[in-house]
Amino acid sequence: MRRPLLIPALCVVAGVGAAEWLPDDLGRGSLLAACLGLGMAGLWARGFMIGLCVALFGAGALSYQATQWPLDPDDVRWRIDGRGELGRIRGILAETPSVRLTERRGQWMERTVVRLRVTGWRPGEGDWERASGQVLVSSQGVPDARFFRGQSVEIAGLVSAPPGPAAPGLFDYATFLRRQGVGLQVRCEAPGDWELGPGANDAIPWSERFLTWARGRLSEGLPDDGATRLIWAMALGWRTGLAGDVDDGFMRSGTLHVFAISGLHIALIAVLLVRVFRLLGWSRAVCGGLSLPLIWFYVGATGWQPSAVRSAVMTSVVVGTWMLERPGDLLNSLSLAALVLLLLDPGQLFQAGFLLSFLVVAALAVFPAAWESWWLAHRPWRPDPLLPAARWSAGRRAWETCERALCRGICTGLAALVASWPVSVECFHLVSPVSVVANLVVVPLSSLVLVANALSLASPVGTALWNAAAWVGMHGMLAASRVCESIPGGWWSAASPGAWVWVPYALLWIAAASVPLDTRRRRFAWWAAAALWLALTLSGPSHPGRPEGTLTIFRSGEAFWIDRAGDADDLLLDTGDAATAKAVVVPWLRSTGVDRVPTLAVSHGDVRHLGGVPVVLTSTPPWRLVAPVGRTRSPSFRALEGWASAARIPFRRVSAGDTVAGIPVIHPVASESHSRADDGAMVLRWDAAGWRFLLAPDLGSEGQAALVRREGSGLAADVLVTGIPSSGEAATGAFLSGVRPRLIVIATGDRPATERSPPALRRRLRELGVPTLWTERIGALELRCWKDRLEVRDARGELRARIDRADRATDQGRAMAW
């Protein structure tokens, strides 16, 4: 067999995937499969390979299920209610605490994140109880240097389930942690909630001392600026250096991978070590035997980061093959590395880093050499084949050298783009063709920076000189990234392609890796299938049951998105405050493939609804900006026209009788004057698939009364979406009598306290008997409209309410909410 380890690795992948997506009672089946496969492999000579594959499938499923189901009765996932419980938790830090930076109101806030192996739990004022399992600790601020990997600690805080997605389609943190075997999160308010636990160790580990020394060494003679911190991030895996717009710039240019301790770092170290040892005349066995411990020392010194461990395993397999003087096959070595990693830590299969690492390296093993050979053989200006290379002119030799290097770089970039594209879209909602060009510049510069870092750490002299060279190289990387990011059409946002993309995608890769494309017929068949898959992916799936309209309400109730099927004139109503816009609204828009908002409308002058307008104008600029008529004391509302003018975006004010993105405005009226901004909030009446929505964000009691007087029975709607005004009563009885809704959505947040729904309102709506949903409790909601039904789903996709319409003419049907 050409690549004997490829199929076993795929069997383990299939087993882990089956354990995640098939029913929970797969456990006995996977155990049976593992035993059956082992028996078949041991007793039936001809069925050895089949039995081995079945056994590996079962082993992969069992290995993953062992991380998902608490086997110990004292596991914290059994003992603690995920809804939240205050207490103290005791355990061992499983890693070095990682500091994350978050920008809030123009200031950088520090937050510490670390995994904890639990040994004990004390609920409230009770006694200590034995416990096991893993939790994730998230704490405001940064604890002191006494807390490091392997330290015994006691932490006080709120133990609860991790948060789910902030909006439909965004990153699901709870699922991510669950797949890593972490089911609970401990939230702390300050480093004062951390204490040393029993048996605490005062001796700082060698890896912590090395990182402290290395950061000081690499910053010697350099200013304390972003480039210096990025050098720490790239050479030492210091994640804190990647914060703010720097992270986004490298992400969009497709060069963020250089800051993860991954294959680029490990391969460069391995090549440098082997070259140096070979110059000394040492044998392969000696070179490999000395290089591998040094590689693993670097991995351990930088904190055993998953990307570094993956790359070290791959490199160890390749170097081991070279040491033993065995025929090398990169794809076969890659399969062995994946097999080992997934059996030891199956949750890595669901990490974007794992998928990108292995898919990109697999692509580099399959495609670039063939593409380069094809180009060199078919280029119009290829040299005379009868003229020996030794007789070429100096200009011709220089041209050939440059062309081959450029061709190799472009083929490598294209192969990496082809391999990473679906995963990048699925995980990061980003397509970056400019990465092919950007990596031609950034990757060589990053290699030079890493070499300078290595010389700075290893050389006793010239430290400041090597650091200066690395600093200049890092500025070159920043400049190249910014230039490539600014190229029109170089990158764009894209919606997740969906599961239907993965099956043909995987089949194409398996075919390319397993079947030699050495005949014209095979090559034509493969490329035809790849072209068909690409065409279907770019055109997007056509779902006959796709909703005719969708209303997305964000968790805080301060922003709404109206999406009409087949209509590009969608609407963003409000943006939330600056933090909500940056953390939720803009990422969600990009997750749906929106780089420019067709229409942005501001409902009223509450800063919690329009504070994020500058963020949206910068990140996903709208084609037009709309605001209601009326006077307000809000400085932000008064600044809207100036913001639009500065961004060269058309701005207009609307009143009752106008339309916004084709949706009628029914409030406010230009002739009316309201003393409070909430009473003059813009109210929209939107019809989708025969369903009528009344959108009245934070409409005050005076505004509600004015609407009832003016519209009368014309206010009737199937769904009422409103919020909590700053003063006055929300959803008054007269207003509800005029609207006569079949479903009410109270769109409000839980912070600050004034945004929360008052108990009197909750009691009154319960007595009304109309199904009511509260975003402060449920989170973001998505209302999907079909002609025969209306469904409301939360951010996880769970059904929360449904309205059926059996007879649209008589408006009969039933409504349910849960």
Task: Please identify what each model-predicted range represents.
Residues 203-221, 230, 238, 246, ...:
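Hydrophobic alpha-helical segments of integral membrane proteins
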Residues 2-43, 351-354, 358, 464-515:
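Membrane-embedded alpha-helical segments of integral membrane proteins
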Residues 15, 91, 353, 420, ...:
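Residue-level signal for inorganic ion chemistry
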Residues 7, 15, 23, 46, ...:
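Hydrophobic alpha-helical transmembrane segments in multi-pass membrane proteins
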Residues 143-145, 151-152, 156-158, 175-176, ...:
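Non-globular, low-confidence helical/coil segments that flank catalytic cores
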Residues 2-6, 236-240, 302-308, 387-390, ...:
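Hydrophobic alpha-helical transmembrane segments
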Residues 1-78, 82, 86-87, 141, ...:
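N-terminal leader/targeting segments
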Residues 57-257, 583-587, 596, 630, ...:
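Membrane-interface helix/helix-cap signal primarily in integral membrane proteins
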